[in-house]
Amino acid sequence: MQLFHLCLIISCTCPTVQASKLCLGWLWGMDIDPYKEFGATVELLSFLPSDFFPSVRDLLDTASALYREALESPEHCSPHHTALRQAILCWGELMTLATWVGVNLEDPASRDLVVSYVNTNMGLKFRQLLWFHISCLTFGRETVIEYLVAFGVWIRTPPAYRPPNAPILSTLPETTVVRRRGRSPRRRTPSPRRRRSQSPRRRRSQSRESQC
């Protein structure tokens, strides 16, 4: 299995420190946390169950739909974009290597073991990594960190003393965005609506009075 990791390092395009952290930490067991520079930790993300994270395919589709132009840009957009670029490249190389192993490894048991290892261990780490950076770009890093802390507190609290439902990340920024975007229109829209709605009534009442 160490040879498998070594093949991953060789085949992975890792020109940045972020991607090097991701690969080297898995190979030699170095105490490197790819989330620390963003204010989170591997332990903090580990509170989220494995089935919480979407599949790699869904996460890649999301990243492509939302940030494809920025990811393909030669310019530096943000550390999250850089981390996403390298994670996507490494995942593509990993899939190429896994396909090669599946084709050339004659022993079915060994082949299934490799596939299972990739999907269970490395697949989960990539899902966590992709989810974290996509969420930070979508909702903001502070909101994501706040959510991770809130979920960690919730999951460690005994069921009798915690709310029945876990915190939901999507509800945090939506309330903020709605308030910020809704204040100015709500202050501006009532007066025209009242004027528009009152003017026909006045006209109708005046016409009725004239008719009487």
Swiss-Prot record:
Main subcellular location: secreted
Bias-annotated ranges (Basic residues): 178-205
Cellular location(s): Secreted; Host nucleus
Modification comment: Phosphorylated.
GO molecular function, one term: structural molecule activity
Region described as Disordered: spans on this chain: 165-212
GO biological process: microtubule-dependent intracellular transport of viral material towards nucleus; symbiont entry into host cell; viral penetration into host nucleus
Propeptide residue intervals: 184-212
Sequence repeat positions: 184-190, 191-198, 199-206
Signal sequence extent: 1-19
Stored InterPro entries: Hepatitis_B_virus_capsid_N, Hepatitis_core, Viral_capsid_core_dom_sf_HBV
Transmembrane intervals: none
Function description: May regulate immune response to the intracellular capsid in acting as a T-cell tolerogen, by having an immunoregulatory effect which prevents destruction of infected cells by cytotoxic T-cells. This immune regulation may predispose to chronicity during perinatal infections and prevent severe liver injury during adult infections.
UniProt similarity note: Belongs to the orthohepadnavirus precore antigen family.
Oligomer and partners: Homodimerizes.
Protein name as it appears in the record: External core antigen
The organism of origin for this protein: Hepatitis B virus genotype D subtype ayw (isolate Italy/CI/1992)
Gene name for this UniProt entry: C
